[in-house]
Each structure stands twice: as C-alpha cells, then as structure tokens.
Design a protein with these regions (language model features):
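Catalytic machinery of carbohydrate-active enzymes
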Residues: 1-301
Length: 301
C-alpha cells in the first residue's frame, strides 16, 4: 500500500527490484491513488494495480458510498489471498486500508512511521531508522518485512527505459520541469528564462511540459520570443515519461516529475529551497542537487 504522491510512489520502485531479485517469482499487487495508477505497471514485479480515490472520495463521501464505488474497492482488496500486506506509507489513511485485506499486515513501528498511530493497525511493526533518504528507508522496510539481506549500493528502479525512448531520436534537448506544488518550491521565472537564453546561445533546444493552465501560462512566458524554447502540448504521465526518457538532460524544481527523471536515469540538476534533498531528493545516477543556503532552509514550509 503506497497511495501517493508521485515522488513517493517512484521512491518505492527500487524496493520492489530488491525483493524480486532476492525472492524469484514474487509479485506485488499495489494499492495506489487513481491518478498515479500507471506508474506501478512499469515495474515487472507488479501483478495487479488496485486504484484508490481517497482524494476524490473525501469531497463527497455519501456519493462514494451510494454509487457502490467504495464497496467495489473493498471487494477488489478481498479478491486475492495474499501472504502479506505491507503498508509502505506509514500514514493513518494507508493503514486504514489494510483493514480490508485478509492477510497479515506489516508496517513501520511507532518510532519509524510518519504518523505513529498508523502502527496500531499492523501485526508486525518494523523499525527503520529515520534521517536517511526515503528510497533507502523503503528498501530497508521491504528487506526486513520479507526476510532478505539489503543489497549494497545504489537502488535500481527496475524500469525498462529503452521501451520509452522515442526512435529515431530527434536532435538533443533539455527538459525544464518548472511546475511544483508549493509556492516556496518555485524557481523565479526570470531565472528559467535566462537559463533558456543561455542554452539557446549554445544551440540547445529547451522543452517545457505543463499539467494545468497556470503551468502552461508560465511555460509560455518562459519561452516567449526564444527560438530554442518549445512549449509542449498537454501530456499524460506516460507521455511525459517518454519525453523525459529521450531528453539529454533535465533541470527541475522539487517535483514528482524530477523523481521520474531520476528513475529514468536522465542527468538532472534539481533545485531545492524549503525541502531537504538528503531525505527526499532525486535519487539515482547523475543527479545533482543545488540547495538554498538561506539560514532557514530546509524549513519544510
């Protein structure tokens, strides 16, 4: 059970790779927020994806019950006989979902979980040290829960990158991942534009994806009048993954798509202000973190 967000879901993939190598033939069914349901399908160790819509259901609980959607979700959880349920999120909302599966439940103990009360829902409560990167914490959780030795070295996301790369490859380009959720995570538009201009002087094309009207407007402002900057059409997650996989490099703020770039082994410079890259930064090969040197950073606000 790892329902959200985009970055958190991507962080769980190396743990699945570890488990699949340690226990040949193991498969995972994954409970995930409906908007991110495509991501688990990219990993070969995932059998079935069970979408959940907590974000949408909260807006109209009565309609969720009346429509039968909640009943069908519970039925899907009970449709299979599992050896173990692993709450990889450590939140009350994820722990609550484990109640509907008829199998032993494992998760983080009260000193390890983000929400300590979540541990009350588990039969097996496992200790995983805080103060380390989220990917490594998840790798340790899976290893302890499933009883294998944690592999040494950098985790492997297990994605088939070659399947996503567009062939034949067009001319090289750099992707700007400028959209993020918190206002404090944004990089000033004037800096984005200056960087695009400098890349233009070196003959490098810049592409800008977007996911909502505000991001589209920002992308258009950054690209305005620059011959080397291209605002992409709106893409779904798989479309963005294809564009990322074919990119020569990427510049990103702290955003879920930045973690996807890392998972696809795209050389990326990630910019961090209020968050701590040591705990939740882009994890992978050729990843560079530039963090704010403000005295208050990382304030997590």
């Amino acid at each position: 059970v790892k329902t959200s967000s985009l970055g958190d879901i991507i962080h769980a993939l190396p743990a699945l790779t570890d488990a699949a190598r340690a226990i040949p033939g193991i498969t995972f069914d994954w409970v995930v927020e409906e908007g991110f349901a495509e991501i688990p399908t990219w990993h070969p160790a995932v059998g079935k994806v069970i979408p959940v819509a907590i974000r949408r259901w909260r807006k109209n609980i009565w309609q969720t019950i009346k429509s039968g959607e909640w009943r069908r979700f519970k039925q899907s959880l009970r449709a299979e006989k599992y050896d173990l349920v692993l709450d990889a999120q450590g939140l009350l909302k994820s722990a609550w979902l484990t109640r509907y599966v008829k199998a032993p439940v494992a998760g983080l103990d009260q000193n390890s979980a983000r929400e300590p009360l979540a541990s009350r829902f588990y039969q097996r409560r496992l200790a995983v040290a805080r103060g380390q990167h989220a990917v490594e914490r998840l790798r340790q959780l899976f290893a302890v829960a499933l009883g294998y030795d944690l592999p040494k070295g950098l985790g492997d996301y297990g994605l088939d990158v070659e399947r996503l790369i567009e062939l034949p490859r067009n001319k090289p380009y750099v992707l700007f991942l400028h959209g993020t959720t918190w206002d404090t995570k944004h990089w000033p538009e004037v800096y984005w534009r200056d960087l695009a201009l400098r890349m233009g002087h070196k003959g490098i094309e810049v592409r800008l994806p977007w996911g909502n009207p505000a991001e589209k407007a920002r992308a258009e402002r950054i690209a305005s009048g620059l011959g080397n900057a291209v605002v992409l059409p709106r893409l779904n997650l798989a479309g963005v993954a294809r564009v990322l996989a074919s990119a020569s490099a990427c510049v990103a703020v702290d955003t879920g798509l930045g973690h996807l770039a890392a998972a696809l082994d795209v050389p990326t410079i990630s910019l961090f202000g209020p968050t701590n890259p040591g705990l939740t930064g882009a994890y992978g090969k050729v990843q560079i973190h530039l963090a704010s040197d403000f005295p208050c950073a990382p304030c997590l606000q």
